[in-house]
Amino acid sequence: TIINVKCTSPKQCLKPCKDLYGPHAGAKCMNGKCKCYNN
């Protein structure tokens, strides 16, 4: 799921993704936006 959070690295996405999807959520930075996924 792409969320509306700007990023330059996946680390910036980890907290917002975990806040939204819980502690097991993963995060990537794609095209300057965060992408969250559940494992």
UniProtKB/Swiss-Prot annotation:
It comes from the Eukaryota. One of its GO terms (cellular component) is extracellular region. The modification Asparagine amide is found at N39. Expressed by the venom gland. It is found in: Secreted. Its main location: secreted. The record marks Y37 as: Aromatic residue of the functional dyad. Keywords: Amidation, Disulfide bond, Ion channel impairing toxin, Neurotoxin, Potassium channel impairing toxin, Secreted, Toxin, Voltage-gated potassium channel impairing toxin. Disulfide bonds join C7-C29, C13-C34, C17-C36. The record marks K28 as: Basic residue of the functional dyad. Pfam families: Toxin_2. GO terms for molecular function: ion channel inhibitor activity; potassium channel regulator activity; toxin activity. Negative results: does not inhibit calcium-activated potassium channels (KCa3.1/KCNN4) of human T-lymphocytes. Does not inhibit voltage-gated Shaker potassium channels. Does not inhibit Kv2.1/KCNB1 potassium channels. Blocks Kv1.3/KCNA3 voltage-gated potassium channels of human T-lymphocytes (Kd=0.25 nM). Has the structural arrangement of an alpha-helix connected to a beta-sheet by disulfide bonds (CSalpha/beta). Belongs to the short scorpion toxin superfamily. Potassium channel inhibitor family. Alpha-KTx 02 subfamily. This is Potassium channel toxin alpha-KTx 2.9.
